[in-house]
Amino acid sequence: GATAMAEAAVLAAKTSGRSRLLLARSIHPEYRRVVKTYAWANGYDCIEIPYGASGQVDGEALRGILDKTAAAVCVQSPNFFGVIEDVKPLADLVHGQQSLLVAGFTDATSLGILKSAGDAGADFIVGEGQGFGNPMNYGGPYLGILASTDAFLRKIPGRLVGATVDREGARGYVLTLQTREQHIRREKATSNICSNEALCMLAAAVYLASLGKNLKKLAALNVWKANYLKNRLTALPGWKPLFAGPVYNEFALACPDAGAANARLGAAGYVGGYDLSKDYPELGGGILLCATEMLRKEDMDCVADLLK
């Protein structure tokens, strides 16, 4: 997912001939680090866009730094705080400066219920597909997803598979637009990325085929469970939401002591939340928690009782 965002950002810069990349500070910190590494290697500047009280991109701050030197604006929805962005006004603002919008997501299952960033005007959609049937595995291998509008089909990295019908009426598949790739263009290729994630892709395809339209139900379950746990915890003394924006399956809370809370949960066999002060010093005392379809209601009640 992080690599997909970096590839899209650099592609936008190369296509536009501009040298600045604007990154929402609400993007996953590791994604931002990877984008900055790619940008440094290619001679581009990265500027961070602050978040507002909602946890979403601060629109006024973006207006203040967005101009015609910006190649792309990168955002994430749901973002690192679990907050859902309103992508359409961001796309309109970005396109007003003839810049490109790279819209990411933290959890692919959110696509089952949220409006497509493409329909909202994003030029690139990037993210992590691990949530589609691929187990957690100490950091990988995972499944990066990168999609674009038709205007960039001949420039995006990776392999493209085309479908057609042969003269006997049977559907056939073939690798297409290969003149973009390393084995033909060598050092002039769009990208030198060449890892093969076919196994992860196959697992995702089987998972999605099995779920079918129930992906929407799964996504709705994530929303319900996250908000149930959020409401249980914010009823406790000293616990309150850090942001006012709507959330998917993650949420950020202020709490009396994140370390003590995690220690108590760990002793009871639960994996605690993420201490936000590690990457966001201004959110010292903040904790990022998650509740997915895998978490039972009795577990959420137990967590709330443990933290009383």
What are the functions of these language-model segments?
Residues 2, 29, 56, 84, ...:
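Electropositive phosphate-/nucleotide-binding environments in soluble metabolic enzymes
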Residues 3-172, 238, 253-255, 259-265, ...:
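Conserved PLP-enzyme active-site core in the AAT-like
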Residues 17-22, 47, 71-76, 186, ...:
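Glycine- and acidic
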Residues 25, 177-179, 274, 291:
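Pocket-edge structural micro-motifs
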Residues 132-237, 241-244:
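Active-site C-terminal subdomain of aminotransferase-like
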Residues 211-302:
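Conserved C-terminal alpha-helix-loop-beta "cap" of PLP-dependent enzymes
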Residues 306-307:
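C-terminal alpha-helix
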